Each structure stands twice: as structure tokens, then as C-alpha cells.
């Protein structure tokens, strides 16, 4: 507290959709009640929702634990983002309506810009939907390392985990050098036109 830092407790989840597809979502606790709901969701995902060792959430569990939680959409990896990128605007509106019904004034469309494929398409579609639906937005960054000069080390760790080498021309490149912990000033500059 003396350092001017406020702790925000939250968790990233994979959400199992009814059609067996997965999306990502982040929950942030607003209070002790929200924290209890968050821990209940984490426990249930591990105890009842594991698929191949991966804990997954189900919508019906979320409905029962929505009080005092804020939700970040998951960006292009969330259900709304996946629909937007696939050109399914009606499905995106429907997904957004579900979230805003269960989390009124507590659901935020994430805006991200890391120079990766599809980010600009998602960004423009998400802003348009947010304006249309009067949904708040939040600028986030998919942080994987602290500083830009740590990108190569991160890539080496990914290659080790995948059993590949850095010079393998066929290896997938899922990350960019822009996925570092940006300062507030950098984020404001990046999204100044929004």
C-alpha cells in the first residue's frame, strides 16, 4: 500500500462452449465476495471441468458466481473476439449480450495491439461493437515477458517446450516482441486514437 500498488486478484480461464470450442476470459474480484466466487470457479474447473488435464469453466457455473466479479473479454481469444474475427457479427452481439446480462457494467471488451496477425482486424471490429452496444473497453497487453529485450529468451523457452529450435523455419510463431509489460504511458500512446 505504501508503494502505491493496489492488489487486484483475478484469474484467466479457458471456457468450454456448448459446441466444444474453447474461448478465454479473465475474472477480477471486486471484493471478498468476488474473491470467494473466483475461488469457487477455480476449484470447480479443477475438480469437475478438466479435459485432458486442463481445467475448463462452463457457463452455468459462471451464472451462479457472477456477483462482485469483473470480466475481461479475452480479446481475440474470447468468445466475442472469435466471432468478430470469423465475421459472425450476430453471434458476437449475442455473446456480448450474455456477458452484459450476467455482468451488468462489469464486462469489458479487451483491446490489444501487439502487431500480430489479425490484431488490427479485431481491434476495429471490437471498437465498433463496443460503441454500438455501449460496452466499456479496456486496453490490455498479452504480457509474456517484462522487457522488449527478453523476447529472444522467451522464444527460446517456447522452442524448448515445443521441442523445436530457434532456426526451424517451420516452427509456429505465436508471440511478438510487443508482448512485454508496457508502462501506462506506452499503453496510452498505443491507444491514443481510440
Task: Indicate residue ranges for each PLM-predicted region.
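Phosphodiester-processing cores and adjacent nucleic acid-binding clamps
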Residues: 1-194
